[in-house]
Amino acid sequence: MKTALLMIDVQESFPQRPYWSQTGADVFLRHVNALIDGAQSRGIPIVRVFHTDGPQTAGNPFAHGSPFVRPLTGLAPFEAALTVEKHRHSALVGTPLATWLVENGIRRVIVAGIRTEQCCETTTRHASDEGWEVDFVGDATLTFDMTTPAGKTLSAAEIRERTETVLVNRFATLATVDEALARAR
């Protein structure tokens, strides 16, 4: 089944935010770079997705045209088969991604990127609902600790576990880097 790798929001905008933590980022980059290397060596197309949103001001690292809307430092270089700029959580909303996937005969997508429970999860659910098979590579996603409305802190690991729990066997196959690449063609 023809596959594409979706590299979602792996951009320099995130380290500019107060919630950014380097904890987990190095492991994330190791996994995501292994996905990139594996995809390139197998001829799997890679789609680069950037998130832009909010006011067009110098203080917004996600603003269209911000110098921070560029690949995250440490991300392996790759030639994108398609680059899209999204303004919503799903990479399939308001972008040419769905059309490109159909035109290129893509039936499975591998999801990796930042943030696990936001744009990666939302794109996974949306892609599944639209009929694509999805491999969600949790260790090639990154998120950060969050505080619930009740004041409880959830660790990034807890958030990832929750995301994987709600996606598995419903919206996606959970896969390691090696498993996702082995399934890809």
State what each model feature region is.
Residues 1-4, 31-42, 60-185:
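Active-site-adjacent betaalpha module
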Residues 5-10:
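N-terminal nucleotide-binding beta1-loop-alpha1 segment
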Residues 15-25, 151-153:
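Acidic/histidine-rich helix-loop elements
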Residues 39-54:
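Von Willebrand factor
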